[in-house]
């Protein structure tokens, strides 16, 4: 009897850059991805944490050019290249229940069909998207209303939609690179900023803030991409392995990010006991929700029929997650 043995493909070194440290959520995801690739092939995956290859915009350009094989990028940064990606930044659209969040990110047609095509047009192979936790707002002073945010300079990513969001919320949106947030808070160049809980803890942003407020407006979302030419020129075996590693890492991180958020809240409170946590009530959130409708209109205005269709599909996906 003749035996057929699958010979290993040529060993390659794959470069993977993230927007965070290796101990943050993107780093944990990338490390899990790397482990699966290296255990099941002769390939090596080199991880580049935040700061080693430049800012987020630099990483994206390097991925498009093929200098990186993989990259993580949030819609807040890629939205300037793919305006429709900002749909994930729309306030009060994504769910708060964990079961709905998990189902949505695993089964969304918006992610796995529509955006796969849009990212492909930019020389990027969209592998997956995953949540990094609830976004909270750090400030020096307490606010419970839009009036409380009035005149406050709040740092946001360089997304036109985030800028519109904080204008609608009554604040003064101030785009800054990630690496400048701490210093800007410290010198009162800005009076606040938004980020997921794990990042508030790891970047120690609570040290230069007195209040952390949840208004329930969004989840921080990240996309994992490969350079399209690299992916399409890979063997079928390598593509299957990338898909397997992507799915396993995504399944893991969806649960992990929830646990890390709880841990981050405890760590911050232990490190700075006098920091004040505030969660707005439904009644307090309502004016923010009403203002969010204007932001949806701005999104459609900026993205046209494509954005309108994507928002419609996204809401259908979310409805499926809620009623499954």
What is each residue range found by the language model?
Residues 11-101, 115-324:
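N-terminal secretory/targeting leader peptides
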């Amino acid at each position: 009897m003749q035996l057929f043995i699958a010979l290993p493909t040529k060993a390659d070194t794959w470069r993977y850059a993230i927007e965070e440290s290796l101990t943050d959520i993107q780093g944990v995801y990338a490390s899990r991805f790397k482990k699966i690739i290296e255990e099941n092939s002769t390939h090596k995956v080199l991880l580049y944490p935040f700061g080693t290859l430049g800012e987020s915009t630099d990483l994206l350009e390097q991925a498009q050019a093929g200098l990186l094989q993989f990259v993580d990028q949030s819609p807040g940064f890629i939205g300037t290249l793919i305006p429709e990606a900002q749909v994930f930044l729309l306030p009060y659209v994504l769910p708060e229940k964990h079961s709905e969040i998990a189902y949505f990110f695993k089964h969304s047609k918006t992610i796995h069909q529509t955006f796969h095509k849009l990212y492909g047009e930019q020389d990027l192979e969209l592998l997956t998207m995953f949540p990094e936790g609830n976004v909270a707002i750090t400030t020096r002073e307490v606010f419970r209303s839009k009036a409380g945010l009035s005149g406050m300079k709040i740092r946001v990513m360089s997304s036109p939609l985030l800028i519109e969001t904080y204008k609608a919320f009554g604040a003064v949106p101030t785009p800054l690179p990630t690496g400048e947030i701490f210093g800007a808070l410290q010198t009162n160049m800005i009076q606040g900023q938004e980020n997921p809980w794990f990042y508030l803890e790891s970047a120690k942003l609570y040290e230069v803030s007195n209040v952390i407020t949840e208004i329930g407006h969004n989840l921080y979302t990240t996309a994992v991409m490969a350079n399209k030419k690299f992916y399409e020129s890979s063997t079928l075996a390598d593509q299957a392995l990338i898909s397997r590693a992507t799915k396993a890492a995504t399944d893991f991180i969806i649960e992990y990010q929830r646990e890390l958020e709880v841990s981050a809240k405890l760590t911050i409170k232990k490190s700075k006991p006098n920091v004040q946590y505030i969660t707005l009530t439904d009644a307090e959130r309502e004016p923010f929700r009403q203002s969010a409708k204007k932001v949806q209109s701005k999104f459609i205005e900026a993205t046209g029929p494509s954005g309108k269709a994507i928002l419609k599909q996204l809401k259908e996906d979310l409805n499926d997650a809620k009623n499954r």
